[in-house]
Amino acid sequence: MKKLLLIIAAFITLSAQAQNDDINLSDVISEILEDAAQQDDEEHYTLAQISSEYLENLAATKLDLNTATWSELQSLPFLTDIKIEAILNYRQKYGCFYSLGELRGIKELTQKDVRFLSCFVMAGEPAETKQPSLHRMLTDGRHSITTTIKTVLEQQKAYREDSLGNKKFDGDRSAVCVKYKYSYKNYIAYGFTAEKDPGEPFGIGDKRYGFDFNSAFIRIQNIGKIEKIILGDYIVKFGQGLILGGGFSAGKSTASTGSASSGVSLREYTSANEYWFYRGAAASIRFKNFGVTAFASRNKNDATLSGDSSSFSTVKTTGYHRTDRELISKDNYTQYTGGIIATTHIKRFQLGFAAVGYKFDKMFEPKEQLRYACTRNERENYCYSLSYHYATTLLSIYGETAMDKECNAATINTIEMRPNAHIKVTAMYRNYSKRYLAFNASALGENSKVNNEEGLYLGAEIYAGRKLALSGYADIFRMPWPTSKVSSGIDVIAQADFKATKRYTVSLKWKCKDKLQSSPVEDYAKNQYIRLQNKFSPSDNTSIANVIQWSDYRYGDTHDRGYLIYQNVTFKPRQIPLTIAARYALFSAPYNARMYAYENDVMYFFSVPAYYYEGCRYYLVLGTQIGKRVKLQTRLSQWRYFDRNVISSGDNQIDGSNKTEVNVYLQVKI
């Protein structure tokens, strides 16, 4: 009887939620990744792009709450171990989830958790659990072919012919990516990715094999004790990412709700980014509360070689091979990687241990940028890591400590307190040795590199009833060795979200970063941002949002200010399978006071551009479903500047005040 009442209440709650809150994937990805993408660091933005595609893939293949395993739920980056345990305990107690609204009955899950989960999981009648035959797995699955194209309509400098009829870039101005995937439920999948960047030619030649980048994988899982086997390209994440970051970065704003897991996440790599992955074989085996994962990889990467080609000094992660000079850097060194991970889960305590070794076929001799730079010549390295997590209803303690072959250490440890269902407080301390070295690490920090940093993060979330949510954090950090950019600072965010009615919400966000810069003069640089957002849903299929942002930058004698105003409209007609999303923005800001804003885009494209100078920007995204097998999305966006007649510089220079981009996504399922 109690179960029946829970289901009825959950169904009513979920129906109201679906009609009025307009939960969509773009809003969720924006909340998770926008902060990470705003870092003035190319690697942070690249990881945010990979993370966006990862979340889109998770949403496209929703987890069934009635059959999802512990490790599958760990793939959701916003779920901690205590939340996963609560979901599984609920399922064990009540049998299964008939509605997503039942998640609201789990006290360990916040309102935000339930909203996020609705994009990535499904519920209903339990599916058949009998393992299918191999023939069925290989023949009864679904095929999908996806093509994405991105191009700039205006001619950029590198594509213009000189007096001799030559162009700097050999290829056309379009970025093209083709993906194929076959999958049968959660048992077997295989596929490939082929991609070329703008300016890269398509053809066969020196270091060219049709598309510039080619990737493939085969995944088998849930076969007896075999949890997962992957051949080809894959990603491994362990603990907090001190030695195995897994290519995922969500930034500081979600640190208090991010992964507090001591476990391991192994998944196939399907992104078009050419660096953050392993190429070889990996396998995970589980015996009740104990699991083992092993992997081996051999991967060629881009780098700048020394004069005699016996060493390399700079690793290139852009993946651009548009000119002969860029092509010279392609596949210049080979990285061999191997590792083993063991995890155990005993009641409230989880423990994990990982050992990873790296070896290059050439010596790595990084260029010294500063007299005090943290550089180190290496040809091989190995790291060890211990990850832990202990949780009760009111308290969670988790973290990871790692060490490289020279005994340089990195550690990150967190205490999370939940005195009641409405309040959560997080304290996190990190200390990364100035000479700590772990390739493919990705952990919380001010820098993308996991070294030379110490910091204290304090965060809180308060839910004052169903209408008001308060959240924020303060992150105090310093770099023990001076760098060319920042030596210390504090990063603060405070946000209030108020749900005035079922159809109207207002959000106010304040962000301040105060950091001591070493160049060009030693002084504090202070950035402040204020964002006010009003969101109104006049009907179930229409959403309107108005956003106003102000920015203020101070450094030495420089004082710059800026503003950004934009209007978003989303419309889904009931009569036809069409989705419309549009924005019109006005902005005026010097470069130092630039502002960022997440944008709707087609699948597998990630857009959080910086708004600066003076002008307007607008975009229109159209999406349609043609039957059950064809999905088409297209986006037209344009920058229009009022204060200049030349956009960008160097190879990307456009002679004019407009820059127009077209993105297209086409998926066919068979």
Where are the language model's segments positioned?
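Bacterial Sec-dependent N-terminal signal peptides
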Residues: 1-22, 670
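Exposed, low-structure sequence patches enriched in small/polar residues
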Residues: 169-173, 276, 331-366, 375-670
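N-terminal, intrinsically disordered low-complexity tails/presequences enriched in Lys/Ser/Pro
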Residues: 19-63, 126-140
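Extended, structured, electrostatic nucleic-acid-contact surfaces
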Residues: 56-77, 93, 99-105, 118-122
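Outer membrane beta-barrel
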Residues: 208-302, 417-439, 576-592
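Small-residue hinge/turn detector
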Residues: 80-84, 110-111
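Transmembrane beta-strand segments of Gram-negative outer membrane beta-barrel proteins
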Residues: 63, 133-164, 182, 186-192, ...
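Outer-membrane beta-barrel proteins
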Residues: 195-213, 267-274, 328-331, 402-404, ...
